[in-house]
Amino acid sequence: MRIAACITTRNRSEQLDACLKALWNSTVKPHTVVVSDDSQDVEIQKINSQIVKQYPETIYLTGPRRGVCANRNNAVNATSALDTDFVAFVDDDICVEPDFIANAIDRYSQMPNEQRKYTIITGISTSTQGEKLLPSKLSFQGYFCATEETPETVVIHAALFPRQFFSQEQWDEDIYFGYEDAELCLRAIKSNYKILSCPELQVNVKSTESVLDAPGIGGVSNYELHIEAARLYVGIKRYKNLFPNPLKLLAFLSIYFAHMSGFLLKRGSIQAWPEIIRRSRIQLLWQQENIPEAQPSSSVIIS
């Protein structure tokens, strides 16, 4: 089985090198690795390009700089749909365990071919503090909830998707950051894909810093603004477009605005409301289709 790893990176050269090293030190090597670089600084891009050249079968792309979803689309569209069976999305601060790819192949090998085509497998990530992130379900309000049943969402940097899925669907580029993996999984479920929890797939998060570290508004951080804007967007899309239910949509909006107003008042940040709405881009859900077609990439360097 041919597995491609798509690495999205932004301003973290040291972590990128460690991420690539872990992938290529795997007991079973990836078929190919694609690095899509959203770094703004040309000098950092040059450093990252040189790092990539140290690893065989690794492609370097300059990123679109329109958010994590556009960056992931840029990476996955550089993989061959004819020459790739499964795709993993690995952030630059992730180090896979040496048996990650071997365990994924072993799990897929146990399935009939037709089941393989429609199965997404997801493992577990462990933070630098030892906290584990597990596959989950989405609550009515759009929060991730632990489950012992069939998951509805994946741990994105410890998951594998059939490559054919991205010939049908793409990451939603109207989500800048936050809940983008939940939205993608909702579309996969709607298209009859199944998500299978595979705890033997293990990865480690090696960074405690976010690329979104920046001043927020009042007592709400920049990261939280993006997360809550994305939760609003995904919640509306869930009940309006993906699984239409006017009553659930109305209930979701009522609860969201009531709870968010209380949260902002408690933080002394009620003035953040307009910025959350602006970042959510919910008006696009009433306009044209917002999922891009798969496009071939440019600016490719193969080491």
For each of these PLM feature ranges, what is it?
Residues Y143-F161, G218-G219:
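A recurrent flexible, glycine/aromatic-enriched loop bordering the glycosyltransferase active site
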Residues N222-H226, A230, K240-S303:
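Non-catalytic, C-terminal membrane-associated alpha-helical segments of glycosyltransferases
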Residues K21-P30:
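Short, acidic, metal-binding catalytic loop of nucleotide-sugar glycosyltransferases
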Residues D99-L134:
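Conserved donor NDP-sugar-binding/catalytic core segment of glycosyltransferases
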Residues H31-Q40, L61-G63:
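Short beta-strand/loop segment that forms part of the nucleotide-sugar
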Residues F177-L186:
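Acidic donor-binding loop at a coil-to-helix junction in glycosyltransferase catalytic cores
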